[in-house]
Curated annotation (Swiss-Prot):
GO terms for biological process: phospholipid translocation; signaling. This is Serine/threonine-protein kinase ppk14. GO terms for molecular function: ATP binding; protein serine kinase activity; protein serine/threonine kinase activity. InterPro entries: Kinase-like_dom_sf, Prot_kinase_dom, Ser/Thr_kinase_AS. Its EC number is 2.7.11.1. Residues 195-485 form the Protein kinase domain. The gene is ppk14. It comes from Schizosaccharomyces pombe (strain 972 / ATCC 24843) (Fission yeast). Residues 1-39, 60-152 are annotated as: Disordered. The keyword Ribonucleoprotein does not apply.
Amino acid sequence: MNELHDGESSEEGRINVEDHLEEAKKDDTGHWKHSGTAKPSKFRAFIRLHFKDSRKFAFSRKKEKELTSEDSDAANQSPSGAPESQTEEESDRKIDGTGSSAEGGDGSGTDSISVIKKSFFKSGRKKKDVPKSRNVSRSNGADTSVQREKLKDIFSPHGKEKELAHIKKTVATRARTYSSNSIKICDVEVGPSSFEKVFLLGKGDVGRVYLVREKKSGKFYAMKVLSKQEMIKRNKSKRAFAEQHILATSNHPFIVTLYHSFQSDEYLYLCMEYCMGGEFFRALQRRPGRCLSENEAKFYIAEVTAALEYLHLMGFIYRDLKPENILLHESGHIMLSDFDLSKQSNSAGAPTVIQARNAPSAQNAYALDTKSCIADFRTNSFVGTEEYIAPEVIKGCGHTSAVDWWTLGILFYEMLYATTPFKGKNRNMTFSNILHKDVIFPEYADAPSISSLCKNLIRKLLVKDENDRLGSQAGAADVKLHPFFKNVQWALLRHTEPPIIPKLAPIDEKGNPNISHLKESKSLDITHSPQNTQTVEVPLSNLSGADHGDDPFESFNSVTVHHEWD
C-alpha cells in the first residue's frame, strides 16, 4: 500500500541516479564531467543520496565563480579572507541549492564535492581549460583523498552497478516518520517463525488471537492470525487491509499499537501490543452489579471520546464500538482495537477550530470540529453489533460518522446499567426498539443514581435523527463541550489514575508477565506437525506450496512500526 511507504519520491531518486551513473565520464585530468543532458538539480539529488550525513562539507561561492569563469587568470586567483569553517545549516542549504548565489556568497573554502560538481556540469571542458589551482580541502582542513577514491569507485564500471543497488535499497527503505515523530516504518526481516505461541486469547469467524513471545527479544505480543481462505469465503478480504492501514498509521495512547504485519501463503498476521488488562467487557463483569458509577463511567467515556476524535481527524469511521472491542492497558487506560469494520473517507478534509457559545469553562471554550474531516462521507454497509446499531444503519439509507456517537451513547448506558437501552427478546424486537422507542432510565429501588446532566448527554447521543444527534454538527467538539464534561481536563487524561487498575500476573526480571501458571491450550499446534493433532490449527511457520493464482492479499504489505520508547 502506498500509504505505508516513504512519503518522498523514491522512484524519482532511482531514475536520477541511473541517469547520472550512465552519463558520468572521466576526463583527462582525472576529474569527472557530465554529458550535459541533465539539469543541475538532478546532480544535487544524486549528491544528497551519497552525502546525506556528511554535513561538514562546504561550498565556496566565490571559488566556484572563479573556477567556472572563462578567464583562466581570474580562475587562478585564490580568495582572500575566506572563513575557515561553515555552519552545518549553511552547508546543508548550499547542498540543496537553496543557499546564496555565487555573486553574493562568501568564500568558505572548497571540497571534493565542489570540484566534482563543477566538472560534472562543465561538459566538453578540456585539460588546458582546467585551472591550475586544484588544492581542495574540507572546511576543517582534513585531507579529502579518501572521498576522492570513494567517488572514483562509485563511477568505476564495477562500482556503478554495486552503488546503484545500494542506493536503490537505501531509498526504498528510507524511514518514514509520522507527524508526531514518534513512530517509523522500517524494513526488517520478521515472519511467523520469529514468534512462538503461548496461549489462545480469543477467536472469531475468520481468525484467532494468540499471546506470542518473540524469540529474539523475549517480548510478549498479541498476534492476530487471519485465515485468507475464510476471509475470501465470507467476502471480508478488504477488512484486513483497512485494519492494517489504520493500525499502521495511527499513533494515539488510546488506540492499540501495531508492531509487525506480514503474511504467509495461508494467513495474515497482525502483531500488536499485548494489553495485560484484557477486555473491558470482562472488567465490567467483575464489578459489583456489573456496572460503574457515574464518575467512573465518565472517565472511560472521555477516553473513548478522545480516541474517536482522533480516528475522525484521520478520516476514519470506527463503526464497531462495544465493550468487547475495548482493551485495558496494564495502567488501566483503555485502548480501542478491532478496526476491521472501520471505513476511511477518500477525501478527508481539514479540521477547523470552533468556539462554543455556552462553554462550560474557559479551558473548554475552543475545540476541533472533526466533522469537517469527513463531512461528505457516507457508507451503506450494514455492519455493527445488533444492540449497538444506529437507526440509519437499520433503515439502509447510508450513514456517516454520527454512528460512532450513537454507539458512544449505548456504551455509556451499558456502563451505568449493565444492559443496553433497546435490547429486545430477539433481533427484530431490538431493531424495532432502536427505531421507535425512547431511552428509559430505570428508577427501581437499587437503580444507580444518575445526574440530570448525565441523562441529558445520553439522550442527545441517542437521538434517532442523525442530523440532530450530538456530534453530527461539529463531531467530537460537540460532545466534549457538553456541560457533563465541564471538569474533565482532556489534555491530562493519560496522566489521570483510572478507576480500574488491572490485577496483573507477576513480572519477571525482563519486565514481561510471568505466565508459568498458564496451562498451554491443547488446541495449539506448537510443533507445526499435522500428525500430532486431529484438529487443523493455524501454524506459525511459513507454509509453502500453496497456489492461489490471483492472490487478493498480494498487496498486504509486510510492515514493522518502530516506536521511540522501544
